[in-house]
Amino acid sequence: MPTDNRQTFSMRYDDNLTATLPSFVTHLECAFTGEQHAADQIHNLSRAGKPLLVRYDLDGVRKALSKDKLAARPADLWRYRELLPVRRPEDIVSLGEAMTPVVRMPRLGAKLGGGELLVKDEGRLPTGSFKARGLVMAVSMAKALGIRHMAMPTNGNAGAALAAYATRAGIKTT
């Protein structure tokens, strides 16, 4: 397997991507009104115009997952599958999202007069930006929900990530 995290396309064949695992996502909820929505249906904002938050079966998570169990899995985004909204392995759209390192920045931390400064190096994600984390989920869910066209008002990293993942999934973008 390649050592460069950007070239780990073979990871799509590992158990994180192909195993059928339970999902502990129970529903979506408006934090403002408490209104609940099914997690496996297309939604927009709540009636109050607020984003919908993911809710989980936390007792189920505690019983099924442990730090040791998660640590034993391949180090990629999909090691947390049971906590992600994508339920069926065939709906996963992946470009090889590896875990990204936290880099110590002692000189900059000292220059800023603070304590230890750590920076998460998300530039190692397949599209070179932290935007890949959210858009891999958005496109995977779009695929699961049968969406065939996606649009996003951006000319930056989010647009590049959407284009990359949607192309991988065969979803048209505007």
Q: What are the functions of these language-model segments?
A:
Residues 2, 6-174:
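PLP-dependent amino-acid enzyme catalytic core
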